[in-house]
C-alpha cells in the first residue's frame, strides 16, 4: 500500500559562526524552525528486501542520494540488531518542491523522513534518539528533522535544545542560483568569531545570519533578492543560501508582497511551525 510522508523545509531564523574546529568543521549557534511547506515522499513497502528510488534526481547517482543512503543505513542497523522483519524493502518516489542548494534543508529533510517513515512502516522499533544518531552520520541538519521540533542548535549543529519561537508567516524566495555549502564556509572573509550567547539573550536580539554578507558578495542574485525583499519587511538569508526570506505577522500581508515579486524570483508563502508536519502526521 502506498503511503505519503511530508518532508518539510526549515529556516535558520538566525545563524552565527562561533569558531572553527581543528577538523575544519565550523561551530555555530542557530535557530531552526520548520515550514508547513516542502517535498512529499511516497513510500510503498516491498517484501523482497529491495530499495528502489523511482524518481532519480538529476546529476545524483541513486546510490549517492540521501534518500537511498538513509534507507540502506536503517536497513543495516535494524538488521544487525535483530529488529528488521525479513524481506523489508521499499519503493520510494519524491514530489520535489524544495530547491537543491537553497538553504531550506531539502536533502536532510528527505533523509529524516525516510528514517522516520521506514522505521514506522517496517516496525523496526528504533527510538527517536537512535534515529537521530543515524541521521547525524548522513548530515549535520538531519537530526533536527528526525526529532521534529523547532530547536536552538550548537556545536556543528548537532546539540539541540527544543524551543518555541513565534510561528510567523514567511515569504521565501529562491533567486535561481544553487549555493554549495562549502563555497560559503571556505570563504576566507566568513566571520568565524561571533561571541557565543545564551539562547535567552539571542531570542531578545535582532536576528541575523553571518553567512549573508558572503552570499551577497559572491552571488549577485542573492543580493538582488534581499534588496527587493528588504523594501517590504525584515529579511535575511537562510542557512548558507541561496534562499532568502521575509517575515510577516499575517498570511495576507505576505501574499500581498508575493503578488509583486519580480518574475526572476521563485517565491512562495508558508507558515513557520514548531512541530514538524512529518511528526504531526504520526500523532
From Swiss-Prot:
Q: Which reaction does it catalyse?
A: 4-CDP-2-C-methyl-D-erythritol + ATP = 4-CDP-2-C-methyl-D-erythritol 2-phosphate + ADP + H(+)
This protein is called: 4-diphosphocytidyl-2-C-methyl-D-erythritol kinase
Record flagged with keyword Transmembrane helix = no
Q: Name one GO biological process term.
A: isopentenyl diphosphate biosynthetic process, methylerythritol 4-phosphate pathway
One Pfam family linked to the record: GHMP_kinases_N
Q: Does the keyword Nucleotide-binding apply?
A: yes
Q: What is its EC number?
A: 2.7.1.148
Give UniProt keywords alphabetically: ATP-binding, Isoprene biosynthesis, Kinase, Nucleotide-binding, Transferase
Complex formation: Homodimer.
Active-site annotation:
10, 141
Q: Which organism is it from?
A: Salmonella paratyphi C (strain RKS4594)
The pathway where this protein functions is: Isoprenoid biosynthesis; isopentenyl diphosphate biosynthesis via DXP pathway; isopentenyl diphosphate from 1-deoxy-D-xylulose 5-phosphate: step 3/6
Q: What is the recorded function of this protein according to its Swiss-Prot or TrEMBL entry? A: Catalyzes the phosphorylation of the position 2 hydroxy group of 4-diphosphocytidyl-2C-methyl-D-erythritol.
Q: Which NCBIfam families match?
A: ispE
Amino acid at each position: 500500500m502506498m503511503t505519503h510522508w511530508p518532508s518539510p523545509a526549515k529556516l535558520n531564523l538566525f545563524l552565527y559562526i562561533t569558531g572553527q574546529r581543528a577538523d575544519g568543521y565550523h561551530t555555530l549557534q542557530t535557530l531552526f524552525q520548520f515550514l508547513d511547506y516542502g517535498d512529499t515522499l511516497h513510500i510503498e513497502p516491498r517484501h523482497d528486501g529491495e530499495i528502489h528510488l523511482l524518481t532519480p534526481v538529476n546529476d545524483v547517482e541513486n546510490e549517492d542520494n540521501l534518500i537511498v543512503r538513509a534507507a540502506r543505513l536503517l536497513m543495516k542497523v535494524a538488521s544487525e540488531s535483530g529488529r528488521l522483519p525479513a524481506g523489508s524493502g521499499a519503493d520510494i518516489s519524491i514530489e520535489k518542491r524544495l530547491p537543491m542548494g537553497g538553504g531550506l534543508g531539502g536533502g536532510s529533510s528527505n533523509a529524516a523522513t525516510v528514517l522516520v517513515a521506514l522505521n514506522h512502516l517496517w516496525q523496526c522499533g528504533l527510538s527517536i534518539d537512535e534515529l537521530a544518531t543515524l541521521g547525524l552520520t548522513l548530515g549535520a541538519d538531519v537530526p533536527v528533522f528526525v526529532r521534529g521540533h523547532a530547536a536552538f542548535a550548537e556545536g556543528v549543529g548537532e546539540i539541540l535544545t527544543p524551543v518555541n519561537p513565534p510561528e510567523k508567516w514567511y515569504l521565501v524566495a529562491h533567486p535561481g542560483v544553487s549555493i554549495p555549502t562549502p563555497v560559503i564556509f571556505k570563504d576566507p572573509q566568513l566571520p568565524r568569531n561571533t561571541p557565543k550567547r545564551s539562547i535567552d539573550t539571542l531570542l531578545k536580539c535582532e536576528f541575523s545570519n553571518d553567512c549573508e554578507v558572503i552570499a551577497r558578495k559572491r552571488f549577485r542574485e542573492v543580493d538582488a533578492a534581499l534588496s527587493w525583499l528588504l523594501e517590504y519587511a525584515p529579511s535575511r538569508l537562510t542557512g548558507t543560501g541561496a534562499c532568502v526570506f521575509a517575515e510577516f505577522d499575517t498570511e495576507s500581508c505576505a501574499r500581498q508582497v508575493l503578488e509583486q515579486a519580480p518574475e526572476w524570483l521563485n517565491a512562495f508563502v508558508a507558515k513557520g511551525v514548531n512541530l514538524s508536519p512529518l511528526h504531526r502526521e504520526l500523532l
